[in-house]
C-alpha cells in the first residue's frame, strides 16, 4: 500500500492545499495529512477545527472512500512522524520558484536523514498559485470575501470567527 504523507499547518486549509490533496489521492492508496503543532506558533483555528475541516473536505472528495484519509498531529521532525505511520513518500506543494528553492533544501535535508523517504512535489493549479493561508486570514480579518480561495465550510468559519472579533 502506498502511503502519502502531506504535512502543514493548514490554518486554514486553502484551495491550493486542496489541489495538492487531490493529487495525493491519485498517487497513493492512503493519504496522511499531518498538522504540525508548534508551541511558539499562534494559530487562528484550533487543531480540532483544522482536523474537522480536512476530514469534511476528504468526505466531499472521496465519499465512501474517505477511509483513505487520515488526519493527525505531529510536533517532532516530519520524517519521524512519516516513518511512524509507514509513509511511502512525502508530498510538498509548490506555488512558485521561491517555494521550490525552499522545498529543495528541505528535501535535501530530509533525504540525508531519511533516505528511504522520497519527496514528491506537486504544483498548485494556476488558480491556486497565489493563495496562502496568511493572505486568506488577512482578507477575512478585514471582512473580505474568501470564497474563491477556500472551501465553503472554511469560508463560513472564517467569516464567523472574524465577525465576532470585529463585534458585528
From Swiss-Prot:
Q: Where in the cell is it found?
A: Cytoplasm
Q: Which cofactor does it need?
A: Mg(2+)
For substrate, which residues are the binding ones? 9, 41, 78, 92
Single GO BP term: coenzyme A biosynthetic process
Residues at the site labelled Transition state stabilizer: 17
Broad enzyme group: transferase
Q: Where does ATP bind?
A: 9-10, 17, 93-95, 103, 128-134
Q: What is its main location?
A: cytoplasm
This enzyme catalyses:
(R)-4'-phosphopantetheine + ATP + H(+) = 3'-dephospho-CoA + diphosphate
| E.C. number(s) listed in UniProt | 2.7.7.3
Q: Which GO terms describe its molecular function?
A: ATP binding; pantetheine-phosphate adenylyltransferase activity
Task: Tell me which GO cellular component terms the UniProt record holds.
Answer: cytoplasm
Q: Keyword set for this entry? A: ATP-binding, Coenzyme A biosynthesis, Cytoplasm, Magnesium, Nucleotide-binding, Nucleotidyltransferase, Transferase
User: Pathway it belongs to?
Assistant: Cofactor biosynthesis; coenzyme A biosynthesis; CoA from (R)-pantothenate: step 4/5
Extract the SUPFAM superfamilies matched here: Nucleotidylyl transferase (SSF52374)
- Which InterPro entries did the record assign? Cyt_trans-like, PPAT, Rossmann-like_a/b/a_fold
Residue spans crossing the bilayer:
none
Assembly and partners? Answer: Homohexamer.
The record's section on NCBIfam families has: coaD_prev_kdtB, cyt_tran_rel
Do you know which PANTHER family this protein is assigned to? PHOSPHOPANTETHEINE ADENYLYLTRANSFERASE
Q: What role does this protein play?
A: Reversibly transfers an adenylyl group from ATP to 4'-phosphopantetheine, yielding dephospho-CoA (dPCoA) and pyrophosphate.
- Annotated family: Belongs to the bacterial CoaD family.
Protein's recorded name? Phosphopantetheine adenylyltransferase
Amino acid at each position: 500500500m502506498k502511503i502519502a504523507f502531506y504535512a502543514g499547518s493548514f490554518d486554514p486549509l486553502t484551495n491550493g492545499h486542496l489541489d495538492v490533496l487531490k493529487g495525493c489521492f491519485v498517487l497513493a492508496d492512503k493519504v496522511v495529512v499531518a498538522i504540525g503543532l508548534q508551541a511558539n506558533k499562534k494559530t487562528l483555528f484550533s487543531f480540532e477545527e483544522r482536523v474537522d475541516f480536512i476530514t469534511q473536505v476528504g468526505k466531499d472528495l472521496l465519499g465512501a472512500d474517505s477511509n483513505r484519509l487520515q488526519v493527525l498531529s505531529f510536533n517532532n521532525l516530519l520524517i519521524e512522524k512519516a516513518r511512524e505511520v509507514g509513509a511511502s513518500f512525502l508530498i510538498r506543494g509548490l506555488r512558485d520558484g521561491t517555494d521550490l528553492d525552499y522545498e529543495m533544501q528541505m528535501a535535501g535535508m530530509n533525504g540525508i536523514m531519511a533516505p528511504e523517504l522520497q519527496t514528491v512535489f506537486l504544483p498548485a493549479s494556476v488558480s491556486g498559485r497565489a493563495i496562502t493561508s496568511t493572505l486568506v486570514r488577512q482578507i477575512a480579518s478585514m471582512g473580505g470575501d474568501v470564497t474563491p480561495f477556500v472551501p465553503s465550510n472554511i469560508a463560513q468559519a472564517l467569516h464567523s470567527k472574524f465577525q465576532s472579533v470585529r463585534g458585528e
